[in-house]
Amino acid sequence: MQRTILLFVLIFGMSWHALALDKQALTDTLNALVRQHAYTESVKIHSVRVKNKYVTIRTNRALSTISLSANDVRDLRLLVSQIVLGNNQGKVTIYTDDYEIGELVTSVHQSRSKANRYTLPTTTPWVTNTSHPYSAKQGLEGKHIALWGSHGQYFHQPTESWRWQRAKVWTTVEDLYTTSYTMPFLVPMLENAGAVVVQPRERDTQTYEQVVDDSQATLKGQWAIGEGAGWANPTTHLLEGDNPFTKGRYIVEVKCDEKNKGEVIYTPTLPAGEYAVYVSYNTQPNSSSKAQYTVMHKGQKTTFSVNQKMGGGTWVYLGTFAFDSDKTNNYVSVTAAANGKEIVTTDAVKFGGGMGSVARYKQPNSFENVPSSKDLPESDVAMIDSAELLANQANAITSGLPRYIEAARYWMQYSGIPDSIYNYTDSKNDYVDDYAARGIWVNYLAGGSAANPKEAGLNIPLHASLAFHTDAGVRKDVVGTLLIYKDHDDEMCKTYPTGKSRILNRDLADYMQTQIVEDMRAIYVPEWTRRQLNNSSYAEARHPKVPAVLLELLSHQNMTDMKYGLDPRVRFTISRAMYKSFLKFIHEQYGTEYVVQPLPVNNMAINRQAETMKVTWQATEDALEPTATPTYYIVYTRTNDGDWDNGTRVTTPAYTFTPEKGTRYDICVAAGNAGGLSFKGETLSAYIAPEEKGKVLIVNGFTRVSGPEWWSDSIYGGIRPMSHTVPYGKGVNYIGEVYDFDSRNAWKTDDNCGWGMCYSDHMDHPTVGNTFDYPALHGKTLAEMGYSYVSTSVAAITSSPDSLITLSPQDYDLVDVILGKQKTYIMGTDTSFHCMPAQLQHALTHYLQHGGRLLLSGAHIASDMQGKEDAAFTKNLLHYEFRTTNASKTGKIRIERQLPNGVYTFRTEPNDTMLHTENADGLFPTEGGIVVARFPEANVAAAIGHDATAEGGSKTLCWSIMLESAHNFPALYQQSINWLMK
């Protein structure tokens, strides 16, 4: 800003009068200032009044769309004074968007007075995991946040069909794309910081669902049917106005004491898998604030305290757990209060996400979709007789899709929200109902609490809400990030029910935009575009009566934006920026110090030391956040085929345990501090066989998560065929491959959106990515074969000079290197995920030169090794060289020699079971190499072996597929191990 002042003093050193009131000169000055801050509209000056030393300027809203500090405002006034009056002594007032510019300084730059902060009285949180061995006092503990990813499938009445709300482009659709931030990243980050996060869409991708009602539960103690309604399992689809929480009953404890506590046990019958667990109950004036719930999942016990003074009559999320069919070790129970003053009620428990169950049909006087910023058309309510109503209902159809794909309108109906909330248009337009309802739903959640005391609702004290969208539009460079807030509500009131000014919406918007833009520029894209801070009347920004913003993160239509936006690392960074913006905004309101949760640990390894196992790891430094330093760690353990325990807290980056022989141990670690917990690191595994056949070291070298590969020329461009994203864990945004690569093809309709348009054949299921648990998968088969094993991250070998992991045949009879889809990936200036870095090559060379046995597998073990030194390593030590890419589309492998004859198949398409191999390398044997298996369609090698054990040398077997993608992985893996260990 100082440089801007100097520049314009030199240019416009004469007085305003000497310039003959040249409004254009002043306009140019202000526009230069605005362009330094954001990509926004041009400043237009409506009026300039000069009286003595007083200058008053009124402009359009452009100046209000940038983030301004107090220093910026001061310097701007001095600049205007210098231009208009010829000196800096003027008293300058500038109005933009009906605000004096000084009123637009946010708490990002300058703390507000206590009288202008949004605070709520301390209450018992809605849900608390009481098994967690940590707290987050300087995180978001005790805070409640409502948020949602945009859109979802909805029923389009004019065509009587279920449709996306946005276009299918660049392998995704906005309806699911924003969910790929909220579901795997943003919501867990907020929850790890201690927040309770409430969403108006299903959060579980599990399509199987079972709701166990209280009438199906096992009761211990004295319970009675409560007054009023409760949940009842629908006998058919939900039709217009149906509310399943008004069709049944709930139960309430009658009498209990410490010796004879009542208990209700809900036992499902489920196929083995992971399921979200939701509970429901009825809120009474004397409801317990600490109702005790226990989730028994594969024999592990996790306990929760639920504040039943809020949230009655809807689904309350506890967590996601692994269950199997053993009923004695898989159930949910709730225990009576036993304090004589408060009561516990219970209604039902829901396991899994399920399929959409709301059936819709065309209504009289339905109308076409109307944007959120526009007024709705006027229409009369048409009368319809009962016969016509029944006929219409008979034609009602469900989406036929998993519930997590559907729009918020339908989740609200299924979860007991009154139709006065979600049926905004009297059922004339589901699209409008959906976007209009989300903000009203926020107010219903907060109704009765200190956040919204005058409205009826669920009594949840919300501290903030977020509507998360992406935008449209095409540019050569980055479209970037827009934030929308509204300074008044539907009644034109500029304060929240708490009495605080809604200008705090601007503060939250500024925190979020600033954090996203700064983090993206620091890590990935120095030119990431900062767009406007818009004070605009969109329903999701206007309706909520708590601090609320609407985020338009990037353009899902723009190829440059999506080069970054399809990369899970970018989505992690942006989600972390959003989490940090909530953290900083809320702590600013309370005047307290925040601590940012750490990043996940790295360089993890398990070492066997006689009869004990030592787990080691390292903290990951966050260069952007000095408070994100770990002060403790949580070590999680899973044995055999069970579920994870609740963790053991340690203060140093090491953990030693004594394993039982014959028991498999899977270990992962999270880093913690006063701000909460990081994501869990990768899963390693260890096992000591009762009768040991040999010792194996499993090396996990598959660390890649990335977007697809892109290409472009002057006209055409897009995602390379047979190049898929590698999601983090489970991806929810991929719907199909791109088929329009012509940049000249413009958007016409969402069904004909031009450049970047894609298929949607994968829209109905998530796609498995890098699950970071492959040592456990390999270890299970090794244990069944009688081998002991430990495992390590590749970084513990390649990045730690003092690593405890060294490769020696005296320590390990066999080394199993997992490379999966590891491959150099270029994003901007970043080139990560090289298949076999030099340090790994050095370690393997040492091991093999001393007679070691090596199993190596990965889809790109040749194509990513074509540099001079890399190619020499594979040629001379591993006895293969690169032949071709895309060696198999059918996913067939024919065994030729060494292993038992047969044909194996592997996954080549995105699926919800295991990461696939879409473009395997074809290999060619070099001197001493043996073709063990081929891809029949290309007649090139899929596996190359080498056996020099007769001369006291090494033995290797190298597979050019992601071995884990094989449909019969255990058999193929076992045969590979058997041959190597002969």
Regions flagged by a language model, labelled:
Residues 377-380, 384-394, 402-502, 534-557:
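Active-site microenvironments of hydrolase-like enzyme catalytic domains
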Residues 656-676:
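Beta-strand-rich modules
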Residues 817, 821-929, 936-937, 972:
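A glycine-rich, often tryptophan-bearing local segment used as a flexible ligand/cofactor-contacting loop or short
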Residues 249, 254, 328-331, 348, ...:
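Active-site-adjacent mobile loop/cap segments within catalytic or ligand-binding domains
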Residues 170, 174, 185-193, 201-202, ...:
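Aromatic-Pro/Gly-enriched surface loop or interdomain linker
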Residues 585-627, 676-694:
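Pro/Thr/Ser/Gly-rich low-complexity, intrinsically disordered linker/stalk tracts
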Residues 58-60, 65-163, 346, 350-397, ...:
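Non-catalytic propeptide/linker segments at domain boundaries
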Residues 332-343:
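Short beta-strand-plus-loop segments that form exposed binding edges in beta-rich domains
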